[in-house]
Design a protein with these regions (language model features):
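Catalytic-core signature of thiol
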Residues: 1-222
Length: 222
């Protein structure tokens, strides 16, 4: 195939497109109604009506706002329903703290990053950068198994004892600051490894960093 797109190619593409009248029908539908509406198949909608024979009680609703904790909200919603049912609690008056889970999520993720740096054999910065070890070191995202691990280790907290605060619903800036701090800590660990610091001292450094992270998160999330 030629390296450059030629006008002959464009003419051939155009002729192929225009030779199929169905393309023009699709084009008109999308340009007039948008892609999403144009893709709707009414027969599928008619065959799949949102009618259910089981209705679950409705609990409190919380605005996720500017954070990426959908995985935490989903996990807590599942647990809250079962807890309210088993303990005979009014679901509309009961909620669990997503902020509590998010606190330990960040602390655990920072620990994992530190441990990865301690375990790494090649301390060359270009290698670390190429392996993307620090690119997304402490993010907001998560999944069910990660949620389960945090709950099994740290338990749960009623929402009223650790509610959402100003920054907990606007976590992008805080996550950025926290990542910067963790990355700086990792550079210190890498430098210490290059100086052949023994494993016990590296672990002490990590514990110091984790204590700082705990204080950081406590001041911001409560």
């Amino acid at each position: 195939m030629k390296e450059q797109i030629t006008l002959d190619m464009i003419n051939n593409f155009s002729n192929t497109y225009n030779s199929n009248s169905f393309n023009r029908i699709i084009e008109n539908a999308i340009t007039e109604n948008g892609l999403e509406k144009s893709c709707i198949d009414k027969r599928i909608i008619e065959e799949n009506q949102p009618v259910f024979n089981i209705e679950l009680p409705d609990g409190k609703r919380y605005d996720q706002k500017d954070n990426y904790r959908c995985w935490i909200y989903c996990g807590l919603n599942t647990i809250q329903y079962d807890m309210a049912k088993n303990l005979n609690i009014d679901l509309k008056k009961f909620a669990l703290s997503n902020n509590y889970i998010a606190f330990f999520d960040k602390l655990e993720k920072s620990n994992n990053v530190y441990q990865n740096i301690i375990n790494i054999q090649n301390t060359d910065w270009e290698y670390v950068d190429k392996e993307d070890i620090l690119q997304y070191c402490v993010n907001e995202g998560g999944h069910w198994q990660w949620f389960v691990s945090i709950v099994n280790k740290y338990g749960l907290m009623p929402y009223e004892y650790m509610p959402d605060v100003f920054e907990s619903l606007r976590m992008q800036n805080i996550t950025g600051l926290f990542n910067d701090k963790v990355k700086k800590d990792c550079i210190k660990l890498l430098n210490a490894k290059r100086e052949n610091t023994n494993i016990d001292d590296l672990r002490k450094m990590k514990e110091t960093f984790l204590e700082e992270n705990y204080i950081f998160l406590s001041k911001i999330l409560g």
